[in-house]
Amino acid sequence: MYSAVNPDCRIIHGASPVTLLKAIRNEQEIAGIHAAMQRDGVALVKFLKWLEASVPTGKETEISIDKKLHEFRAEQDLYMGESFDTIAGYKEHGAIVHYEATPETDVQLKPEGFLLLDSGAQYLDGTTDITRTIALGKLTEEEKTDYTLILKGHIALAMAVFPAGTRGAQLDVLARMPIWQRRMNFLHGTGHGVGHFLNVHEGPQSIRCLLYTSPSPRD
């Protein structure tokens, strides 16, 4: 595309004016998002009911549940496909950022521990991106504690009241504070914008730490 630009044209390097326009939802987009989320929620409820009954059989794996979730979503009206490759990580795999199960890494699910499920769909009236941490059975005390700390961060962020102009990096602290107090952290973002039948990650809005390299005071 760049090479097709007429050399007589003046090229301006900067943010596209379309970016900010897309960041503000009109009434039709908001209604579409609500409708898409409702249908996606129906698919997820059906999937979770199926998962609860299927895991104890010992026949399900990370890959097989990914396929089943796709089937439930495909039943919904206006479904066009997945918005990104599903991340279904069982136990240790759930700690790998953007993990994708392969025939070599695929593991059997058991009625114990956590399953991390990060998935979404494209519908004609909206895009979804849903992450859930699902207890498949008995949990360790460490797992219970970690889950509770993350829940506290979610609640703090969801309940936040802030003035216009507040940055996502400032709000990000609210979500991380409970785990920071335990000397823990996560190195990925906390939240991001979602497109309207477009990119599942869509800026410029984002809730994440400002990660950069700076000299240490002791250097």
PLM feature spans:
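Active-site neighborhoods and metal-handling regions in enzymes and metal-associated proteins
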Residues: 1-214, 218-219
